[in-house]
Amino acid sequence: MVDPTFEPDNVAVKNQMREKYDSVGRSFLSNYKGRSRQAAEGMILSHGQPGLYWMEHKIDTAFAMGRFSRADRLLEVGCTAGHYTMKLVRDGYQVVGLDISAESIRAAQVLAQDLGLHTEFIAADVEDMRGVPDNSFDGAFSFSTLRYVPDPVSSLSEIRRVLKPGGRAVVDFPNKYCPWFEFLKFLMGGERHIHDHTYSTGQVKRMMQQAGFVNIHAKRIIFFSKGMPGSLTPLFKATDFVFERTPGMNYFAGIIMCKGEKLGA
C-alpha cells in the first residue's frame, strides 16, 4: 500500500521528476514536428474518448468548486505540455501554465504559438515559485501533480502565496481507498509512476489547512481509468454520475478534488 511517506532526498526526487517530464516534452515535440495546425488542434485533445471525458469532468468539477470564471486570472500547476491550459485558453479563460520541466514548457510554448493562443508558460518548481509575485492570481488548479511532489504542504503554501486575497485553489489527489491504485492498475499491466502517493480525504484536508487555506471542501469523483475502451465511455459517465452521488460508494472513487480559499484582506 502506498502512503505519503516522502523520500529524504527531495532534490533527487525533483531531479528525477524533471528528467521524466523533460523526456515527455522532447517526445511530444518530436511527434509534433512538421505537423499541420489541424494536427496541433488534435494534440490538445489527444486522449481518446475516455481521456477527453476525464479531462472535461476534472475541469467541470474543479471550476464549479473554485467558482472560476473567464474574468479570473488562473494558474495551472503541473501543466506538462499544456493540454489543459490550451484547451481552457481556447475556451476563453485566462490561464498561465507552470511546470518543473523546461522541456515540457518548451513543447507547450511551441504548440500554443502554432495555434495562435496567447498565454504564458513558466518553468518553475511549485515548492519554490520565487519568480511568481505574491497575490498574482484569482485562482489556481492542479491535476495529477501534487501527488508526486516531496512536500505537498510547501507546494500548497506556495500556491496560496501567489493567490490574491479571497482567491481559490482546487487540487486533486488519488484516493487511497480506490481499488484501482492499490491493485487493479497493476493487474491490468499498468506501471507505478515514480514517487507516487495516495491519500485519504482527511489527509488532503489537513494538508490544505496546514498550508493556510480556509473554507476547505472536498469531493470524490471518477471510478474508471481513462485507459478503458472508448466504446464504454457512455457507461462510465452514467456510472460516475450515480456512484459519485451515492454515500458509501463514493468513498471508493478514484480522485479526491479539494478546494480551499485564501483569507481575504
Where are these regions (language model features)?
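Conserved beta-strand signature within the Rossmann-like core of class I S-adenosyl-L-methionine
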Residues: 166-173
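Short, glycine-/aromatic-enriched active-site segment of Class I SAM-dependent methyltransferases
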Residues: 175-195
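Short alpha-helix
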Residues: 196-211
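Class I SAM-dependent methyltransferase SAM/SAH-binding core
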Residues: 81-128
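A C-terminal cap/extension of S-adenosyl-L-methionine-dependent methyltransferases
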Residues: 183-189, 206, 216-265
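A short acidic, Gly/Pro-enriched loop at the edge of an enzyme's catalytic core
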Residues: 127-139
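A short glycine-rich, Lys/Arg-flanked "PGG" loop and its adjoining helix->strand segment in the class I
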Residues: 153-165
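Conserved class I S-adenosyl-L-methionine
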Residues: 2-68, 87
